[in-house]
Amino acid sequence: TGDRDGGDSPGYGVWRSTDGGISWHARNSGMGNRTVYEVLMDPTNSNILIASTNGSRIYRSTDAGASWTYTSTASSCKDIAFHPTDSNIIYASGTSVNRSTNNGVSFTQINSGTPTGVQRIALAVSPDEPNWVYLIAGDGSGLDGIYRSTNSGANFSTRTTTPNVLGYDTTGGTGSQAWYDLVIAADPTDANVIYTGGVNLWKSVDGGATMTCTSYWVSPQGGIDVVHADQHALEFSLHTNAIYNGNDGGVYTSSDNGVNWDDLSSGLAIAQIYKIGVSQTVSDLAINGYQDNGTSVSRGTSFITEIGGDGMECAIDPTDANYMYGALYYGDIRRSTNNGASFSAINGNISEEGGWVTPYKLDPNNANRMVAGFDNIWINNNSSILTHFLKISNKTFVRNIHD
């Protein structure tokens, strides 16, 4: 339980269901209410479980989770994996790479050829080459490298350091969110085929020596399919040639080796709403801002996404519903004058960056007046002029504005 990616959800240890997920019971004796990043079951003994948790800890259970023993400290460990044919060998990675050769009783850090000074390392194995281990490492500036071991993790060598497969562009570019979105997977039938995920998805057919972008987070581009940004999970089906991807937008799958991707998220009630703006003049009209899934206009039972990215503060003019307001992160406020058909930025003259969720309010008695909170309080007394904000405070760093 908990959220391993953003660290926003508290954890309550490991829970277990014995009736196919209908009911759940805590199994965290000896572990407590920790955020659990990953739980693995020994493929040869279902009573043995290995869990990575917050606090850089690895726990082991020999009684199907009834009790847990703290076995090792592994720096910011998030990923763990069993050797495909030898369950005595377990790999763990976070900001370092660690290995157990005694079924998780203890772990030793591997320093030969492994990355150092990075924000995060993810790992992958494949039964096609059971002694191979892949690593992908990155920091805030981009990809550190893709690495491979061919001797069960005893040492690693660099496969590539370019392009920046953690960047925002289909060519790599700059930047990275390795602390947040980082994943790697190796094909179970061909260990030379690997997929990596950061903002976009990338693929290699030569063991990571060369990488090709296989999805783009904005829109289809040059034969590259669109997949929602921020990749967190990649899993291969053992029964078909499908690969499944979990990201900030939901679940996607590809059945043609990553060329095309289908969104499977329909029906999943997973949207996290930051803010809602409700019309005072039109029944069932609202505008909603979602974490990771943009801003949508709701008319009764239909929801139409109008602004991408992360949707934040929302509002509708109290006297004229043609005027709607949405926002992206850090204070990028947008306005529609045509009932949500299109939006334009309105805060071009504000010289400050706002908070992640930047607050703003419309005056209920004068819909032409908007107050917005950045480092200072800014006011626009004539919303028909898009860049007519005036600063009216001195370094207050506003987080909330109340009517």
Outline where the language-model segments fall.
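Beta-propeller blade termini and top-face loops
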Residues: 1-403
